[in-house]
Design a protein with these regions (language model features):
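Non-cytosolic beta-sheet module surface loops
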Residues: 136-138, 187, 314-316
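Short helix/loop capping segments that flank catalytic or ligand/cofactor-binding pockets
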Residues: 72-75, 145, 163-164, 205-206, ...
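Active/binding-pocket-proximal capping segment
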Residues: 318-320, 326-351, 385-392, 411
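N-terminal, post-signal-peptide metal-ligating segments of extracellular/periplasmic oxidoreductases
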Residues: 2-165, 170-174, 258-310, 400-424
């Protein structure tokens, strides 16, 4: 898209899609072309920032793509007209928006991934003291090419003083269809964060444009925070969400829905519902043993050896308050909203606490540690349930049996190899 296309006269809605609302407010109602030109200069500058960097082991770079596509949720018996969606290509049945990690792919390969969404969005890892760059490419939607919305990355919980990289389109820049933009962050505080699209955010968050960000302390990547007391052997990301299949159907079929009637019927961990939460990780670029889970790549199964310390990083980017519980294990809450709860020079009080359950509201994150107990000696592993104690959410669309936000913690007698990456 040329600069002339950006400067073309736009409707008010089209202008807001470029995230220029705040620019126009600053420049005045008669300076819309100048505001758009300024937005274009920011985009061009961001492309320059994506040039090769000097090697720094603390820096991280990601290339995320915006697209839509289809995923899988256990179908309602007999169907309801909304789910399974009759337009879904086999073996999928549910429409969604999302981000895909296309880091390292060529431009041609990136374009081939349009319409191949990921739910939840990729986990981003970074290090305190380093620089994080996330390049966002807006390829648009395959199922709904009429939706030419802009999109953004909002680093939820990050105290970003630079509006251009905050991802709130009214105050910064929305990434238009066919464009790329690079977000830049200098990281100072370890912890568990989230990210999501902040453009038409109610819809885009609900439709699946959500992910987790881990910032590790520079002192030791196997600590949760800058304290050896937060050391761990294994870590697992658990991002909570909800799916309202009426909304998903209407979005795919170009129908309107009333947000005051929000009534989700599936409750997810890492984009899946139980028992699919126990299935292994997949790769969106390859077809797994269960092909319907190809674009829901993140397992929620927690595995460890007896005596190991395990870090659970969980966050909620749904719209409902949840209450997650572990049966038979004590959790030590060491962090909340990317803030260490142990004593520090600035905050000498020790605010860590031990519990077996935690209430987590939308937009909150918690870091919890537990030490795996001794193995019972019976069977290959011992099982502990990790579930939402709001029992009404432990089903899939009201169907019989367990579903929703539940997974397992499996404790082995020492037979597991070291963890190669989170959630493995």
């Amino acid at each position: 898209m040329s600069q002339n296309n950006l400067s073309r006269k736009l409707t008010r809605r089209g202008f807001l899609k470029l995230g220029g609302g705040a620019l126009a407010a600053a420049a005045g109602a008669y300076l819309v072309p100048q505001a758009l030109a300024a937005a274009n200069r920011v985009l061009q500058s961001a492309r320059g920032a994506a040039a090769p960097l000097a090697a720094n082991p603390l820096d991280a770079r990601y290339h995320l793509m915006v697209t839509d596509g289809w995923v899988y949720l256990p179908p309602k018996p007999g169907g309801t007209g909304f789910h399974p969606d009759p337009w879904a290509p086999a073996p999928f049945n549910t429409y969604t928006f999302g981000f895909r990690d296309v880091t390292g792919l060529s431009d041609a390969a990136v374009r081939q991934e349009k319409g191949k969404v990921q739910l939840n969005s990729p986990v981003v890892y970074a290090t305190e003291g380093g620089e994080l760059r996330i390049t966002l490419t807006n390829l648009g939607f395959a199922q709904r090419p009429d939706l030419t919305d802009g999109h953004t990355v909002h680093f939820h919980g990050f105290p970003n003083a630079i509006p251009a990289f905050d991802g709130v389109p009214e105050l910064s820049v929305g990434v238009p269809f066919g464009r790329s933009y690079t977000y830049y962050y200098r990281l100072h505080d370890p912890g568990t964060y989230m990210y999501h699209c902040h453009f038409e955010d109610i819809e885009h968050v609900s439709m699946g444009m959500t992910g987790s960000i881990f910032v590790r302390p520079a002192d030791n990547p196997k600590w949760a925070y800058k304290d050896a007391a937060t050391a761990f052997d294994r870590e697992f990301a658990l991002l909570l969400g909800e799916v309202w299949t009426t909304e998903r159907f209407n979005a795919a079929h170009i129908q309107e829905h009333d947000w005051s009637e929000y009534d989700p019927d599936y409750w997810t961990i890492n984009g899946r519902v139980y028992p699919d939460t126990l299935e292994p990780n997949t790769d969106p670029l390859t077809v797994p043993a269960r092909p319907e889970l190809q674009y829901q790549p993140n397992s929620s199964l927690i595995t460890c050896n007896a005596g190991e310390k395990v870090l659970l990083r969980w966050a909620n980017l749904g719209f409902q308050r949840q209450a997650m519980k572990v049966d038979g294990l004590a959790l030590t809450i060491v962090g909340k909203d990317a803030k260490y709860l142990g004593p520090t020079a600035a905050q000498p009080a020790d605010r860590r606490y031990t519990t077996d359950s935690i209430d987590i509201s939308p937009g909150e994150s918690f870091d919890a540690l537990f030490t795996a107990p001794a193995h019972s000696g019976v069977g290959a592993y011992d099982t502990y349930l990790f579930y939402n104690r709001k029992l009404a959410y432990l089903n899939n669309a009201g169907m019989p049996g367990y579903g929703g936000q539940m997974t397992e913690i499996r404790v082995y007698p020492g037979t597991l190899p070291p963890q190669p990456a989170p959630n493995f």
